Amino acid sequence: MRRLETALQRYAWGKSGSDSMVAQLKKSEDSDFDVDEGQTYAELWMGTHPNGPSRVMRDGHEGTDELQGLYGSAEGPGMFLIELLETHPHYLGDQEHVGDLPFMFKVLSINKALSIQAHPDKKLAERLYATRPDLYKDDNHKPEMAVALSDFEGLCGFRPFREIGKYSTM
């Protein structure tokens, strides 16, 4: 098992300062991290996304297993997770996602309601990105699973079209 250095994302909808679970988790991972009470902390990312890649941290035991030599001779905090997966694709099993993760693990700390989001399947995501890369930032589908770490309210799904029509006054 290896410790990961995570990436913070600050958005206006995040919780502020120490009230944010994201800030608390980042502080527990990195004792040098200073929580700014006036700053919002919205998301903590663990993955290979280029906007917030995780690092696999040195732990002093690099010479004791198959990771020996991966960090090279340079000093530093560690290597990017994507580099580890590119050099050791078997860590992902027999999946087709060699060198990358097929998911992004996030912890969210939400203070304000988020906008409605629509997540297309993989084929539609590829088509949308190919035709409108200005609107669709990548060709990935985005299936989601939520696990509540604290109290929250969430809405999921929509009424069927015919049922919506019953409430329309047009």
What are these regions (language model features)?
Residues 1-170:
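Transition-metal
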